[in-house]
C-alpha cells in the first residue's frame, strides 16, 4: 500500500469530484483530471491525501496544512469506459471528455467550461493514440471535507513538516516509510468524521493559470 500526498490549488468540484449520490446510490469520489502521475500509477488499496496549498488558503480561505480529502483507491479505469457515450459516469461533473469508439479519440464534450481550453488536454488525458493520462481513479471509501478541511494534528510533526515544504508535485510513501505510522494515525482520525460532498454542477476550477500549450 502506498499513500500519495499533494496540495490542491483549487477545490471547486472538478478534482476531486464527489457529488452527492443519487437516491439509493453509493457515494463515489473520482479523480479523472489533474495529477496525471498519481492517476497513472495508483493501484487499488493505495491512499490519496489532498491538502491545502497557500494559493487555496489565500483565494478561498481554507486553513493551511489541513486535509481537504482522503481516499482509498478502489479501482482505476480506462477512458473507453469512463468517457464512453453510454457510460454510467456520464452525468458526473468531471466526465468532461467523450470517447469515440470509431476512431479511438477523446474530445471535450463542450457541455461545461471545466477544462474546455485545449491546453488542459495534455495533462488531463495525454496525447492520441495512447492517452497515457486518461486513467480515472474510483474511490468508494473516502472523506471529503472541503472548506471544512481538518488541520493535521500538531503531534504528527514529521507529516506537518513534509506538508509545509511540499511544492507543486506530490510525495509517495510506502508502508516502510518513516512517515507510515503518522499517516495511519491521520487516516484513523479522518475516518471518524462524516464526509461532505462536492457540488453537483461544476462551472470551472480556479487555478489562476492555464497550462502552457505544447
Name every feature range the model reports, one short phrase each.
Residues 38-41, 60-63, 128, 133-136:
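A general structural signal for short secondary-structure junctions and capping/turn motifs
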Residues 61-72:
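Short coil-to-beta-strand transition motifs
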Residues 1-43, 195-214:
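Compositionally biased, charged N-terminal/linker segments
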Residues 72-78:
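Short edge-strand/loop segments of extracellular domains
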Residues 52-62:
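Short, charged beta-turn/beta-strand-edge "cap" motif at the junction between a beta-strand
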Residues 44-49:
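Loop/turn positions that initiate beta-strands
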Residues 13-14, 57-58, 78-81:
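Eukaryotic short linear interaction motifs
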Residues 1, 79-214:
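Contiguous surface segments at macromolecular interaction interfaces
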Amino acid at each position: 500500500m502506498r499513500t500519495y500526498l499533494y496540495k490542491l490549488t483549487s477545490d471547486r468540484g472538478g478534482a476531486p469530484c464527489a457529488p452527492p449520490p443519487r437516491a439509493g446510490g453509493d457515494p463515489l469520489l473520482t479523480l479523472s483530471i489533474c495529477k496525471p502521475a498519481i492517476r497513472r500509477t495508483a493501484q487499488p488499496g493505495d491512499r490519496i491525501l489532498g491538502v491545502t496549498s497557500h494559493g487555496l488558503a489565500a483565494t478561498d480561505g481554507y486553513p493551511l496544512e489541513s486535509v481537504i480529502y482522503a481516499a482509498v483507491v478502489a479501482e482505476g479505469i480506462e477512458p473507453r469506459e469512463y468517457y464512453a457515450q453510454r457510460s454510467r459516469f456520464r452525468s458526473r461533473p468531471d466526465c468532461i471528455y467523450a470517447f469515440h469508439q470509431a476512431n479511438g479519440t477523446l474530445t471535450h464534450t463542450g457541455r461545461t467550461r471545466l477544462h474546455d481550453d485545449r491546453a488542459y488536454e495534455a495533462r488531463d488525458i495525454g496525447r492520441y493514440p495512447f492517452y497515457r493520462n486518461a486513467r480515472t481513479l474510483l474511490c468508494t471509501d473516502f472523506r471529503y471535507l472541503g472548506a471544512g478541511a481538518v488541520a493535521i494534528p500538531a503531534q504528527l510533526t514529521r507529516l506537518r513538516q513534509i506538508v509545509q515544504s511540499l511544492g507543486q508535485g506530490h510525495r509517495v510513501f510506502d508502508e516502510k516509510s518513516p512517515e507510515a505510522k503518522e499517516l495511519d494515525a491521520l487516516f484513523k482520525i479522518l475516518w471518524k468524521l462524516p464526509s461532505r460532498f462536492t457540488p453537483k454542477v461544476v462551472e470551472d476550477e480556479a487555478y489562476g493559470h492555464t497550462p502552457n500549450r505544447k
